[in-house]
């Protein structure tokens, strides 16, 4: 068996792409998208018709915002025709600090999916793991609108999401690594900080162990990988969302893949509970320079790509 086949014995494999043609060959269970991936996909000629149809069908009666929503849903529906499981569709990052607007947008997106005959159980609404986003997820989960909490970089965020009853979290492995590498500069030691000692891998393991120790139902899906070594160091995580480039590398790899994370191991560990109320959340996030900086940066990047996508839609509509 290749590395991808072995990994599937321990972990649900998810495709992290808006390029649904590319994901077919890897047979993922679920798929994740974000504004950056959708923007990248619509640059390709084969996806241009989806963009043009969204503009043609909806610009007159629902404006730019409506076209953007319809484009996200169009990609989601195409993906759901390929994967047997779920697709993650992201709420505009510019709503990251507005609980009510996030709830309203999520309800609207789910309504659009349901108009196309897609059951809400097959959709995860991606929301940034700000305090306001987590509160939105708490409301939405009670309505059976399942949430994927993204831009997650710390245990404090993870615990608050689990306490809110979020369906799933997406801790960003690669972006955590990026921060520590940048801080270390020339002193960075790739050997000492590789494999299971990778700071992004350690963060996900800490979160996974906490969840399993205290019996949270929230799923852990590692995301944002820089290489297959990070992925294989998290074999056993509930889910891992992986880019097509790294899926291809795993499919071509022949190394033995060992289980790295397990419920039994987590439950046997010595883990202390942490507070998840608002003052504790804000203080812990403030004290974690990496998480604070990467959360802010991630929101800015996703918002910027949403603006680029809007500009593209606006040019087509004019």
UniProtKB/Swiss-Prot annotation:
Pathway: Carbohydrate degradation; pentose phosphate pathway; D-glyceraldehyde 3-phosphate and beta-D-fructose 6-phosphate from D-ribose 5-phosphate and D-xylulose 5-phosphate (non-oxidative stage): step 2/3. Gene3D superfamilies: Aldolase class I. It comes from the Bacteria. One of its GO terms (molecular function) is transaldolase activity. Its EC number is 2.2.1.2. PROSITE patterns: TRANSALDOLASE_1 (PS01054), TRANSALDOLASE_2 (PS00958). The active site is at 126 (schiff-base intermediate with substrate). It catalyses: D-sedoheptulose 7-phosphate + D-glyceraldehyde 3-phosphate = D-erythrose 4-phosphate + beta-D-fructose 6-phosphate. It is found in: Cytoplasm. GO terms for biological process: carbohydrate metabolic process; pentose-phosphate shunt. Keywords: Cytoplasm, Pentose shunt, Schiff base, Transferase. Homodimer. This is Transaldolase.
């Amino acid at each position: 068996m290749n590395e991808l086949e072995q990994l599937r014995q321990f972990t649900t494999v998810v495709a992290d792409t808006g390029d649904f043609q590319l994901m077919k060959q890897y047979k993922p269970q679920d798929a994740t998208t974000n504004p950056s991936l959708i923007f990248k996909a619509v640059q390709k000629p084969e996806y241009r018709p989806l963009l043009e149809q969204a503009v043609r069908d909806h610009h007159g009666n629902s404006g730019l915002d409506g076209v953007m929503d319809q484009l996200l849903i169009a990609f989601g529906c195409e993906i759901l025709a390929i994967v047997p499981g779920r697709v993650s569709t992201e709420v505009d990052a510019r709503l990251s600090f507005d609980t009510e607007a996030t709830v309203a947008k999520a309800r609207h997106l789910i309504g659009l999916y349901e108009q196309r005959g897609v059951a809400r159980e097959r959709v995860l609404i991606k929301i940034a793991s700000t305090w306001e986003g987590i509160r939105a997820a708490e409301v939405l989960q009670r309505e059976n609108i399942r949430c994927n909490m993204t831009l997650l970089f710390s245990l404090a965020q993870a615990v608050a999401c689990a306490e809110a009853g979020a369906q799933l979290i997406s801790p960003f492995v690669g972006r955590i690594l990026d921060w520590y590498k940048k801080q270390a500069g020339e002193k960075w030691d790739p050997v000492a900080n590789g494999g299971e000692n990778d700071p992004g891998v350690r963060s996900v393991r800490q979160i996974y162990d906490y969840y399993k120790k205290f019996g949270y139902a929230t799923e852990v899906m590692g995301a944002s990988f820089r290489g297959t070594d990070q992925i294989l160091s998290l074999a056993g995580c509930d889910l891992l969302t992986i880019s097509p480039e790294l899926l291809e590398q795993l499919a071509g790899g022949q190394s033995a893949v060992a289980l790295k994370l397990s419920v039994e191991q987590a439950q046997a560990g010595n883990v202390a509970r942490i507070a998840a109320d608002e003052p504790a959340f804000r203080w812990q996030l403030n004290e974690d320079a990496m998480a604070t900086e990467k959360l802010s940066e991630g929101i800015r990047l996703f918002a910027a790509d949403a603006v680029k996508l809007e500009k593209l839609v606006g040019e087509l509509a004019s």
